[in-house]
A protein has these predicted regions:
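Active-site metal-binding motif and surrounding structural segment of the metallo-beta-lactamase
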Residues: 32-85, 253
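Metal-dependent catalytic neighborhoods of phosphoester/phosphodiester hydrolases
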Residues: 63-72, 93, 316-323
């Protein structure tokens, strides 16, 4: 079993969890092109992906899921509230549904094509020898003047009318069906899971657990290989460490743990105070100090490797995050064998294999 962190940070998150038989992508917070590029760099074959799993609907975790899932034709696993929140994010801001909005746009286009076709029809010249008298008596319009359609709608027929020119250039436009707009929320397959309920994909058993974060239904994951029972976990984007998260992270061999910010750097940094309050809240992000406290007081010491992830580029320094974690482990002699790595925003981390 192996973990490959493709990206971790405020600008995008994505991790591969794989065995010899099954390969999963956890979050897709980069563009499809960038995800494919990073998988190639890490030696992971995108065509071998079995599914995408989503922790929550924030942009740095879902930016590329639609394009990637449609391109690879693979299922996406959400909790139902997370899926609904993602759909709402991509649906046009309106009181109507996406289908109703699309139908309205197509009707408008058909109406414009009909008006253009009517505008292109020139009136028949009168069949009278006295043209001036006929025009005066019959009320026929001057050439280029506006006329009334059968439905009493005023339509201009000037030779320079852009609608008329457009219709003349493409007389078959009204017969051409409007091209359907791609639904950005379409996915090949959507599968729902529930926090606390085990499910399996291939030979990987997955246990989602609830995390405290300001999203619809955020979760972390524990992955277990059926072959050798190796266990890996992802626990990022959480404001604090509640008892259920501490319990979920026991007997883990490789742990991706959030260490988002240094408290002093955040407080003195450029973020607006409202954003600082959000990050510091119980549904925000785990600080270096909070991650270190978990390692010192509640961590059972079972991990082969601890990866510190989701480091803020604005409000953290990798050396500070590493120092806090190392000092926490140094306080417990039994934990000195644990290896600590730092996930990066700009490049994949080398695969961690068990």
């Amino acid at each position: 079993m192996r973990m490959t962190v493709l990206a971790s940070g405020s600008k995008g998150n994505s991790t591969v969890i794989a065995t010899d038989n099954t390969r999963l992508l956890i979050d897709a917070g980069l563009s499809c092109r960038e995800l494919l590029k990073r998988m190639a760099t890490a030696g992971e074959d995108p065509a071998a992906l079995a599914a995408i799993l989503i922790t929550h609907e924030h942009q740095d975790h879902i930016a590329g899921i639609g394009v990637l899932a449609r391109r690879l034709r693979i299922p996406v696993y959400f909790t139902e509230p997370t899926h609904r929140a993602w759909v709402r994010m991509l649906t046009p801001r309106s009181t109507i549904t996406y289908a109703q909005w699309l139908d309205h746009v197509q009707q408008e286009k058909a109406a414009r094509a009909e008006a253009a076709a009517a505008a292109s029809a020139e009136p028949e010249p009168p069949c009278q020898p006295d043209v001036e008298s006929s025009a005066t008596n019959s009320g026929a319009p001057e050439p280029g003047a506006p006329f009334m359609t059968a439905s009493s709608s005023w339509v201009g027929t000037s030779a320079t009318d852009p609608i008329a020119l457009s219709a003349a250039a493409d007389p078959d436009e009204e017969d051409t069906p409007a091209a359907p707009k791609a639904d950005p929320t379409h996915l090949p397959t959507v599968e729902y899971f529930h926090a606390g309920v085990h499910f399996s994909i291939g030979d990987i058993s997955i246990t989602p657990f609830t995390i405290p974060h300001d999203a619809a239904d955020p979760c972390g994951f524990v992955f277990e290989s059926a072959a050798d029972h190796a266990r890996m976990a992802i626990a990022t984007d959480l404001g604090y460490m509640p008892p259920n998260v501490k319990a979920a992270l026991r007997r883990i061999d490789v742990l991706l743990l959030e260490s988002n910010h240094d408290l002093d750097m955040l407080k003195d940094g450029p973020y607006p105070w409202s954003v600082k309050q959000r990050v510091l809240s119980r549904v925000g992000h785990l600080s270096n100090a909070a991650a270190a406290e978990f390692l010192l007081r509640d961590y059972d010491g079972g991990a082969h490797t601890i990866v510190l992830g989701h480091l803020s580029e604005q409000n953290n320094d990798p050396s500070l995050a590493l120092l806090a974690a190392e000092q926490a482990l140094a306080g417990r002699m039994s934990l000195l064998g644990n290896r600590i790595l730092l996930a990066q925003q700009s490049a994949p981390l080398p695969s961690i294999c068990l």
